[in-house]
């Protein structure tokens, strides 16, 4: 109605314009520009005003549980009015395979994302949570996300993604979420917040928090440095433990601001808040024969808490649950369809069938394959002699296996030999690895390319 008008667009970033009438966009012929998908305003009674997923990378519930009152007071206060899953376990020991499993409900040997050297995108038949939520009419955004998932297709379905590689601090993420909630308050929003503060890293490359440095005795500041040690194999050093606990405390402090805002601006039935982690960490005493146990209970214990519409209040669930169960649970609560062949299960709390066991596996090419099958009372541990091949398959001909009481996994003299336990665990373990067992058959060229893995054998 006002004719042609000119405006200046911010450089290297998207701008938002509110349209209430038919509008035509023009640009000089030599100035290329991109137009995003329109954001439709309006709420629906079939949706919640806010569904927020908070991904706290590497937050081990087995480690956090004893410190919950002192280091996670805001998280515990908020989710005490919701549900806490006390026996939640990860599908894998680190993020690359564990993250896609959460986003799809499929184990890593089904997503085929487990190899750092191979860029593999999720097949379209495995829609992500954001794709499902987009199909329901939500405005989907990731106010803070990791770039790691982009190439694998994990961020499909989002209308907006603000991603970074390393600096994913809770203080920045919370601010970004609050800004996004305010900006798009006329839409029903599905938001994804990825937090990296808690995740430990090799001290050779990362500085510890000032609070840790200021309080740690000088003697604890001197320790062997090995720049090649990955986070999943960090040693049991006090400096790493104190850094982990301090970052837990700071993450909780910042999330407390977010939770207070939500309680002040939303009714309980207007939101669904989902806080979870992808795996734990082993550096609080998990060693076997001097080596780090990357599938220990602390390493694979994950965090999962929910609050809001459809979530029982004040519930602590002791049923066994897996990170792949998050997908079907959101499907049940939000109303999106779930593939029949996913590995995730709907928890009994929401009308599903309880698990009789949970599975955590390490399928890392060049290293031995490791599996933990856990019940409430026992754990079966499996490890191959052969390393995992580049394609994720492994030879199970020579395998070490044992069944142990929970809390005593791989400890000398603690293996349990009972026919009833053998009859329970062995068929389940065989069924889990059936699709990746190569029965000693392999491509010679593939093995020849990795002589350091296979001793130079063809």
Give names to the regions the model predicted:
Residues 1-458:
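Catalytic domains that recognize anionic headgroups
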């Amino acid at each position: 109605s006002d004719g042609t008008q000119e405006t200046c667009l911010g450089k290297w970033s998207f701008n938002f314009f509110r349209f209430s009438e038919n509008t035509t966009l023009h640009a000089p012929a030599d100035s290329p520009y991109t137009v995003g998908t329109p954001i439709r305003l309006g709420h629906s009674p079939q949706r919640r005003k806010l569904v927020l997923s908070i991904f706290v990378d590497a937050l081990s519930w087995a480690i956090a549980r004893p410190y919950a009152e002192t280091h996670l007071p805001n998280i515990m206060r908020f989710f005490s009015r919701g549900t806490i899953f006390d026996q939640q376990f990860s599908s894998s020991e680190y993020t690359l395979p564990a993250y896609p499993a959460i986003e799809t409900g499929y184990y890593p040997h089904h997503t085929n994302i487990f190899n750092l050297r191979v860029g593999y995108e999720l097949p379209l038949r495995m829609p992500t949570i954001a794709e499902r939520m987009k199909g329901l009419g939500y405005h989907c955004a990731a106010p803070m996300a990791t770039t790691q998932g982009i190439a694998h297709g994990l961020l499909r379905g989002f209308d907006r993604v603000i991603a970074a590689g390393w600096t994913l601090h809770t203080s920045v993420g919370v601010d970004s979420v609050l800004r996004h909630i305010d900006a798009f308050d006329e839409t029903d929003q599905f938001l994804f917040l990825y937090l990296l503060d808690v995740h430990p890293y090799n001290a050779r490359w990362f500085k510890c928090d000032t609070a840790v440095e200021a309080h740690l005795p000088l003697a604890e500041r001197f320790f062997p440095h090995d720049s090649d040690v990955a986070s999943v194999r960090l040693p049991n050093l006090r400096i790493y433990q104190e850094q982990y606990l301090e970052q837990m405390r700071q993450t909780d402090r910042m999330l407390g601001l977010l939770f207070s805002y939500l309680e002040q601006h939303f009714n309980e039935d207007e939101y669904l808040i989902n806080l979870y982690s992808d795996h734990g960490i082993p550096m609080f005493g998990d060693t076997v024969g001097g080596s780090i146990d990357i599938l220990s209970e602390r390493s694979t214990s994950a965090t999962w808490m929910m609050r809001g519409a459809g979530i029982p209040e004040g519930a602590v669930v002791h049923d066994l649950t897996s990170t792949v169960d998050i997908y079907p649970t959101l499907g049940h609560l939000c109303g999106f369809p779930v593939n029949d062949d996913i590995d995730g299960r709907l928890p009994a709390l929401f009308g599903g069938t309880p698990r009789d066991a949970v599975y955590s596996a390490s399928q890392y090419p060049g290293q031995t394959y490791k599996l933990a099958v856990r019940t409430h009372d026992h754990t079966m541990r499996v490890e191959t002699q052969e390393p995992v091949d580049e394609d994720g398959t492994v030879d199970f001909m020579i395998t070490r296996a044992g069944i142990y009481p929970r809390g005593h996994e791989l400890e000398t003299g603690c293996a349990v030999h009972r026919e009833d336990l053998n009859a329970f665990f062995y068929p389940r373990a065989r069924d889990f690895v059936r699709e990746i067992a190569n029965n000693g058959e392999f491509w010679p060229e593939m093995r020849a390319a990795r002589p350091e893995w296979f001793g130079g054998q063809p």
